[in-house]
Curated annotation (Swiss-Prot):
It comes from Aspergillus campestris (strain IBT 28561). NADP(+) binds at residue 142. This is NmrA-like family domain-containing oxidoreductase cpsB. GO terms for molecular function: oxidoreductase activity. GO terms for biological process: alkaloid metabolic process. Campesine G features good insecticidal activity against the global honeybee pest Galleria mellonella, which supports its future application in the development of biopesticides. It is an enzyme of class 1 (oxidoreductase). The lineage of its organism: Eukaryota, Fungi, Dikarya, Ascomycota, Pezizomycotina. InterPro entries: NAD(P)-bd_dom_sf, NmrA-like, NmrA-like_oxidored. GO terms for cellular component: nucleus.
Length: 339
């Protein structure tokens, strides 16, 4: 490990009560080498108090207030930052952007004067990889913040982590309706039907799926054990790589339920008529044009995250299989959908 060992090393998590940040905080709190500071907009929330009970220092700060950000990160050795792309304020074309927020946070971290390593939840530049043909707003904003952080020249390492599709999406009833009913609502013929455009150009390419609660935090934890090794390198955060037809196979194997996959003819059919899903439609278009290059030039493979997960398990002194190995879709479906 490259982290100092004289005393606990402070890692501050921005967005600590969100799904990504919470997973990171909980993982790091199991490593006696680390102290965790959790930044939240509401320190009295249940999620914040749960982190406090686990041993985190909880501080309240507004990401739009640079002086508050600066104070919140003061004394930290490393930072994990994720901003909420789905915040309603970012939906307007003439309102503030996620880049605006990210820039303030990066500036505040730099001015805190102590943070050496930044792990930033980023995404591929859809515009760059399609020569401007597709621009998925959320991915583009995150990519711009990543580049801005790198351009400051301040950090010893900037480690961009690209999160795959959340397995937890399948728990969301609204998304189930968009997905064709899968995995919650049988259709008129009694099937749980998963319906999406193709991910890929002419064949079904693997989609990166991440178990956010169980795996994402450990992947980031693994990065923070040797952050300079990952400076400027895309870190694919996924637990399983399975095409949409393979998702159906995994669910059927795990539950024995009647299930099928129905491919939508065009990328723009996904969630048609729902403005909030425009970015997801553009992402399918991106997948078609790039043949499923979700992570850009980094392959959709579990090799890197599996290594990072195993390293985190060692650091937590938890070498048992369910702590050291990534969760497969089959395992995830078995844990939540088998009757």
């Amino acid at each position: 490990m490259t982290i100092p060992s004289a005393s606990k090393t402070l890692v501050t998590v921005y967005g600590a009560t969100g799904s990504q940040g919470g997973s990171v905080a909980r993982s790091l709190l199991q490593n006696t080498e680390f102290a965790v500071r959790a930044i939240t907009r509401n320190a009295s929330s249940t999620s914040a108090q749960n982190l406090k009970a686990l041993g985190a220092e909880v501080v309240q700060a507004d990401g739009w207030n640079k002086s508050q950000v600066q104070e919140a990160f003061s004394g930290s050795w490393a930072a994990f930052v994720n901003t909420n792309s789905e915040d309603p304020m970012f939906m307007s074309d003439d309102g503030p952007t996620e880049f605006d927020l990210g820039k303030i946070i990066i500036d505040g971290i730099v001015e805190s004067g102590s943070v050496e390593h930044l792990v930033y939840s980023s995404a591929v530049s859809t515009s760059a990889f399609t020569q401007g043909e597709v621009t998925a707003k959320a991915a583009e904003m995150k990519s711009r913040v990543e580049k801005y952080a790198m351009a400051t020249g301040y950090f010893k390492s900037v480690c961009p982590v690209y999160a795959g599709w959340y397995m937890e999406l399948f728990n969301n009833t609204d998304f189930a309706r968009v997905f064709g009913g899968f995995p919650k609502f049988p259709d008129a013929e009694g099937y749980l039907t998963l319906s999406t455009p193709r991910w890929g150009a002419k064949t079904d390419m693997p989609v990166p799926w991440v178990a956010v609660e169980k795996d994402f935090g450990d992947i980031v934890h693994g990065v923070l054990l040797a952050p300079e090794r990952y400076h400027g390198k895309v870190i694919p955060a996924l637990s399983d790589a399975s095409s949409f037809p393979q998702v159906v196979d995994a669910f059927q194997s795990a539950t024995g339920k009647n299930v099928r996959y129905v491919r939508q003819a065009k990328w723009d059919m996904f969630g048609a008529g729902i403005p909030e899903l425009e970015d997801q439609r553009r992402l399918f278009h991106f997948g078609e044009l790039t043949n499923g290059k979700y992570f850009g030039d980094e392959p959709t493979s579990t090799t890197v995250p599996a290594y990072l997960k195993a390293q985190a398990a060692k650091a937590k002194n938890k070498g048992v299989d369910d702590e050291a190995e990534l969760l497969t879709l089959n395992q995830w479906f078995r844990s939540g959908f088998r009757q």
